[in-house]
Amino acid sequence: MKVRVLVCAVLAIAATTFTPLAQQKAQNGDWPSYGRDPGAQRFSPLTQITPQNVATLERTWAFDTGDTAMQVTPLVIDGVMYVAAGDHIFALEPETGKLRWKFADQDMSRRGLAYWPGDAKTGARFYTGASNGRLIAVDVRTGELAPGFGTNGAVDLKASVSVDGGAGNFGLPSPPSIYRDVVITGGTNGEGAPATGRLYGDVRGWDARTGKMLWAFHTVPRPGEPGSDTWPLGAYKNRSGTNAWGFMTVDVERGLVYVPLGSPTDDFYGADRHGNNLYGNSLVALDALTGKLRWYQQLVHHDLWDYDPAAPPTLIDVRRGGRVIPAVAQITKMGLLFIFDRVTGDPIFGMEERPVPQTDVPGEWTSKTQPFPLKPPPLSRLTFDPAKDFYALTPEHASWCKNLWEKNQLVASGPYAPMPLGRDVVTFPSTLGGGGFGGVSYNPQLALVFVNVSNLGMMGRMEPRTDPKTGNVTYGKNSVTGGAYGRFWNPDTRIPCSAPPFGELVAVDVNTGDISWRVPLGIVDELAAKGFKDTGALTLGGSMATAGGLVFIGATADRRFRAFEAKTGKELWVTELDADAKAAPMSFLGRDGRQYVVIMAGGGHQLSRTKPAAGSNLIAFALPSK
């Protein structure tokens, strides 16, 4: 459902007057934000590394951050590399990895930093979050907390979203977005059922100099605000979720910030939230200076599967009907790639509401339809036919999977089928996608976006839960392997029970909506040793496209880092890392004239199956020195 609006669920905190400050464009050799540009295209204009020479790439240095499971993409600005990792921000010499300075604080964002260039009166700053709910500003020059921002260089993000003084958990796992002098934050606020002390998931804008809150957008509308009729009366109270825990992006020219919003809580049960539940599972476009809602598209109605859009909305240009349409591409956990006009919110290739199965859980509510783009087609598996889709490469694993199916009398369900009461079903995809938080990369010269997807199902059923104090009965998700996130694999080997490919890299032509090519992404080492080399591997992370005609990607649960030819999908280079790379790579031009490609080998994710499971090294590659 798409709506353009002139008014919205916004709390205006202060008048928005700003000193004019041009949004700086990246120097060709720099990488100044997570996606390189504010629109998260993840495209490097560098051309030194090409399909003809990429096979000679070699490891040039590694820096041990001391923290594992990091998903960070480092920044390079004016000849210095900056990386956030756990309890530290490091400034490095980018050609060597030599440490310049470090800043220490409590468990900061695992995915990176946001850079603000400052002005004549205020020096350049980095902004990041800490696990205790603070937004931190660090002086780029000194590596110390920025004076004048909030209290001692930090703002308490919990204060303005607490309910009756509640002290629930709140964090900022992804870097904020910045437009002019406004720092825009989302955050994590818990995924449990509504309860006293839960914190709201409001998106907020802050003065980059002082830390003063400028505006707040209510992601769950308050009574009387647009969208409140998609909730029961009072259902916003103590409601967590419906939050921007991933990446937001900015259209600098139009002053819009694009926000992918998460699922309302509880993730798998919604009897207390009848309705479509705006703005949960929506892509919303806000005025970056005021927080006013410009348009939205809800991508999942009344989510019962934890199918929140986790990826950055990527700004692209679509050439169609003789004109260039400014567009935004959003990949989802369902493996659906939605492409919208980023000014109006209209779907460029069409979108339709399709009938979906309904629930049998007492008191639950389900939407009769769910939205699907007409093009491109789904990029990952959405169905499972036990007659033809079982894993069958090796007898041991095939037997294990068949036994799992028959012993537990599993049944295959279709897209958006609610988990039934008392019997286990297999649904595709799982909560890990489809597409994940790494999102897409975009080559504007080829008009291609590149998407890594996983083909992994999940098992589940709904079962009653009785409150011992009140006797009230609610329902929660469980599975044959225990817990709400039962994945359709052997948990000891983490090999899926569905036929490969388990992971794929897909290229989509944004001018036509057609799939240009798709290839298996990754290997399973023990299967490759038996001759099965095209299985792909489960993926979690992101890619980078380059003007040199390449796509670089780690992301696979096989400890590898790869380069593909952008036009064809041919794998041209692969190297083994210290751990899985659940991050997105970047590239920069060193002062020595060499193009470098850098990836964080942090490992430690839900799909990892190699040893060591976690790593702490940031690793750089370049062509051999002449």
Language model: regions and residue ranges:
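Bacterial N-terminal signal peptides
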Residues: 7-17
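N-terminal pre-domain segments of enzymes
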Residues: 18-47, 367-399
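Repeat-blade elements of multi-bladed beta-propeller folds
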Residues: 31-35, 67-86, 108-134, 168-195, ...
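N-terminal cofactor/phosphate-binding cores enriched in small/glycine residues
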Residues: 40, 44-119, 126-151, 155-158, ...
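A structural motif specific to WD40 beta-propellers
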Residues: 60, 98-102, 144-147, 156, ...
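Extracytoplasmic beta-rich repeat domains
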Residues: 62-73, 102-122, 151-175, 218-247, ...
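Beta-propeller blade signature
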Residues: 138, 142-143, 199-213, 273-292, ...
